[in-house]
Amino acid sequence: MMDLLRDRRAVALLLAASLTILSNATISPALPGIEARFSGTPDAALLTRLLVTAPALMVALCAPIAGMAADRFGRRRLLLAGVLLFSLAGSAGMVLPDLHLILASRLVLGIAVAFVMTSQAALVGDLFQGAARGRFMGYQMAATNFGGFVFVAFAGWLAGFDVFLVFALYAVGLLYLPFLWRAFLRSGRPPTTRRKG
């Protein structure tokens, strides 16, 4: 366990995995407040509910394109670009004045999640084989579940102050970026595939 977690690339991939849970359920505690704030907008109830499902729709549509982009531009670069776009699009809801614009930002967020998920999964395949990959997948599931619990709980707390503060949680990706950059780009070494024997 400790050998795997001492690999900063493994830790970076776990951090990236923890972001993906943010895309949908995190804003759920803020939905009633968002709908109330934009009650004068036509179809506000429908648009508010689409804020949750829009990212998943874009992930489904863009995942194949993200796979091609990862092969074309590099998985590490796509991961970093995805995390940056994730942070910017996700946190945009704090300042956008219109429900339609917030929905548009959620669609862009889905594109970012497709970038992160696709490149992260590809890098896991590059870096780990056999038992090491199995152990990593277990850690990834734990990181995702723990991230979901923490982020949703924190979102509920923030929504008690202001519903739009929930969108600030997406900026956590900006805190991850320096570590991700150090893990994947600073060394200039490509990921290596570990094989038995």
Regions found by a protein language model. Name each.
Residues 139-184:
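Helix-loop-helix hairpin linking two adjacent transmembrane segments in secondary transporters
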Residues 60-98:
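Conserved MFS/SLC helix-loop-helix module at the cytosolic interface between two early adjacent transmembrane helices
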